[in-house]
């Protein structure tokens, strides 16, 4: 690349970042149309961090401290939540831009450098969670950010650089080290995917300077976090990860690993990946083919662990194959070109949805939407999406018991010896949480920390109850925060009735004494006290 090309690449990336951020701010708010549960989970964590709480130390989550910190920073600075979300994403994009620019201009030819740079910026600032669905969603932004960082790291590790010499190797190592540290502090599964590839790349190149740079920057970030949060942070982080790994509440959020690899949505991508490995090796690019093969298990694992199982990694595969096919003097170029274009075509719906999302949100501002959160926080949804609460009740038919229908019914949840209806909350989560929280407050129980017997616990966002110190915004198992709870809220319709049953069972097994204080068609409110034998 000439100097003018490098400046043009930086300008193009900055233009994508600036245009998307401007569209987000110009809309005057954000207008999500799905994933309310995940959105409220994100809001809880952001408010915790904006108040100075640390993940793992002050509340339970498998997500790292950086998964929501950019948004929390701007909330803490006084911005409304919607504005803070857009500015936080812009900050992520600005932080990624120099690293992505370096990787693109040093590893990729001009057209693919621009495609890669634009894709990384879209992953940073989109208003959809890296899926092909066009509806605006504020959930799982950390997955997009982690994909962007992972792609930068993989491009540097897998593809050969144009620059030789110690300075270039140190620069590559420093960027990869910072990227690995960021992945560890966003979502650990991405780190698991990246580390083997980086380690193998450094080993094959016998790059001692690069390895030292990776270790130095990575350990430097760990030291900074330790100084800020204390050494107990890492122990608590590991404890949360182990607790989630052991739970059977949500072992994986979508398809099985076999379906991710060989199901109708995944088999084409899997075949393209192995084709790229084979063609790279046939063309003499043995190192690149081996490193892509080493990356495959991690890419599959991340996809398997992510909600929706969307094969975002096909973007990297397309860039990889099209870069190698353009290399002079290499055979199998046509096959690599077909493979690369095939990968980009498969991932195109995701890229288009991300590119359109700021404009879709801008156009949505004319919709008659209402505020989701108390105050003018700028997150707005259609009234029917908030107020129309839909539930599903499992019940046996009046006839047909002789065919074993009763055995297939979910086990009844008992509260104080009486069964709760097997009712599941399907939609209208915001309206449900708001109404129940306000009713608890109006009944004279407001301002007290509540343990919620459900997977989601966003009631405290609406003012009726207080947040639970040490609790879990998204339940994965155990009784996190129970020592600080003054009340237990049992929803009559739960987001996960099996989780409701599990929490009540664990409270009973732990010897806690529950006393009914209030019962409505929507919830049961209980006082909680330890038994005489409890260490509490």
Regions found by a protein language model. Give the residues of each.
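Hydrophobic/aromatic-rich transmembrane helices and adjacent perimembrane loops
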Residues: 146-149, 304-372
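Membrane-interface alpha helices of multi-pass inner-membrane proteins
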Residues: 169-188, 194-199, 220-223, 295-305
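Start-transfer (signal-anchor) and selected internal transmembrane alpha helices
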Residues: 1-23, 112-115
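Short hydrophobic alpha-helices at membrane interfaces in multi-pass membrane enzymes
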Residues: 156-181, 210-216, 287-295
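Extracytoplasmic
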Residues: 352-532
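Transmembrane catalytic cores of multi-pass membrane glycosyltransferases
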Residues: 20-41, 47-51, 55-66, 80-87, ...
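Transmembrane-helix motifs of polytopic, lipid-linked glycan transferases
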Residues: 87-115, 123-124
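Membrane-interface micro-motifs in multi-pass membrane enzymes
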Residues: 122-158, 259-267
């Amino acid at each position: 690349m000439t100097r003018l090309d490098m400046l043009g690449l930086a300008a193009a990336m900055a233009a994508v970042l600036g245009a998307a951020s401007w569209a987000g701010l110009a809309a005057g708010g954000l207008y999500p149309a799905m994933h309310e549960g995940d959105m409220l989970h994100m809001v809880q964590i952001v408010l915790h961090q904006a108040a100075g709480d640390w993940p793992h130390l002050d509340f339970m989550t498998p997500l790292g401290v950086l998964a929501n910190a950019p948004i929390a920073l701007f909330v803490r600075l006084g911005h409304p939540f919607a504005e803070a979300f857009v500015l936080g994403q812009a900050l992520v994009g600005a932080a990624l831009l120099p690293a992505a620019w370096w990787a693109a201009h040093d590893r990729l030819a001009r057209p693919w450098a621009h495609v890669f740079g634009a894709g990384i910026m879209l992953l940073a600032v989109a208003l959809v969670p890296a899926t092909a669905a066009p509806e605006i969603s504020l959930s799982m932004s950390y997955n997009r950010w982690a994909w962007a960082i992972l792609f930068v790291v993989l491009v540097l590790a897998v593809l050969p650089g144009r620059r030789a010499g110690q300075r270039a190797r140190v620069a590559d190592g420093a960027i990869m080290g910072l990227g690995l540290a960021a992945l560890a502090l966003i979502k650990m599964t991405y780190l698991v995917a990246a580390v083997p590839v980086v380690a193998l790349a450094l080993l094959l190149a016998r790059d001692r300077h690069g390895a030292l740079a990776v270790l130095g920057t990575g350990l430097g970030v760990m030291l900074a976090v330790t100084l800020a949060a204390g050494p107990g942070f890492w122990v608590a982080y590991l404890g949360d990860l182990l607790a989630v790994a052991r739970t059977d509440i949500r072992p994986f959020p979508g398809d099985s690993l076999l379906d991710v690899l060989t199901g109708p949505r995944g088999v084409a991508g899997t075949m393209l990946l192995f084709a790229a490995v084979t063609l790279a090796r046939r063309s003499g690019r043995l190192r690149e083919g081996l490193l892509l093969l080493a990356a495959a298990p991690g890419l599959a694992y991340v996809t398997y662990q992510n909600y929706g199982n969307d094969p975002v990694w096909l973007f990297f595969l397309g860039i990889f194959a099209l870069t190698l096919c353009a290399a002079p003097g290499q055979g199998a170029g046509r096959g690599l070109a077909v493979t690369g274009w095939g990968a980009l075509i498969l991932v195109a719906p995701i890229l288009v949805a991300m590119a359109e999302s700021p404009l879709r949100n801008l156009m949505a501002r004319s919709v008659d939407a209402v505020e989701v959160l108390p105050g003018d926080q700028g997150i707005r949804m259609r009234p029917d999406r908030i107020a129309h609460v839909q539930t599903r009740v499992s019940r046996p038919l009046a006839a047909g018991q002789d065919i074993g229908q009763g055995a297939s019914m979910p086990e009844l949840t008992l509260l104080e010896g009486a069964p709760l209806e097997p009712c599941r909350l399907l939609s209208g989560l915001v309206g449900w949480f708001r109404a129940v929280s306000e009713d608890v407050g109006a009944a004279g129980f407001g301002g007290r920390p509540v343990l919620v017997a459900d997977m989601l616990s966003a009631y405290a966002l609406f003012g009726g109850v207080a947040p639970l110190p040490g609790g879990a915004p998204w339940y994965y198992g155990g009784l996190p925060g129970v020592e600080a709870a003054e009340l237990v809220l049992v929803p009559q319709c739960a987001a996960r009735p099996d989780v409701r049953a599990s929490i009540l069972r664990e409270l009973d097994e732990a010897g806690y004494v529950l006393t009914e204080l209030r019962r409505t068609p929507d919830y049961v409110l209980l006082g909680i006290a330890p038994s005489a034998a409890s260490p509490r």
